[in-house]
Amino acid sequence: MTEEIHYVKADPSGNTTILVLDAVPKQEHASLAARLLQPECVGAEQVGFLTWPDKEADVRLDMMGGEFCGNASRSAAAYLLSRSGQDHGEYRVSCSGCNKILKAVVVRDEGELYDASIEVPLPRKMDIVSLTDNDITYRFYQIELPGIMHFVHFTPSIKTIDKNA
């Protein structure tokens, strides 16, 4: 039996995200996400589930691991703008791993491209981490957000990034 799932695949800053548009029981999120993430299915790095609350937020995003994700939240807001037919908009986004409503601002760039920004919760913790490889020391910022940890490395130019590493 084939199950039909409506979804949008977004690519916010290279962080490919599947946003499931249908109501899916929470206990089925993990198994559905595992299927959708497979390259032979849709393929992406992560899955979020959208719901439409009737309260303070315009959209609710529940990530497959219960974490907060700024890129997926921006994508949810961009999806709302795409449905509105407008060229710009402000949206209130609720996301797992975050206990406040976040304001997102989205502008249609061209076609199906969007420029979206969103408030992010304050980190629980931030540290500086240094790693040395081939006598070169790299400095990273370790940023702990609710449900997820990021390592951020600033580079003088995107051209200096080894995309095959």
Regions found by a protein language model. Name each.
Residues 1-114, 144, 150-165:
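A glycine-rich beta-to-alpha transition motif near the start of alpha/beta enzyme domains, typified by
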Residues 118-161:
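Surface-exposed beta-loop interaction hotspot
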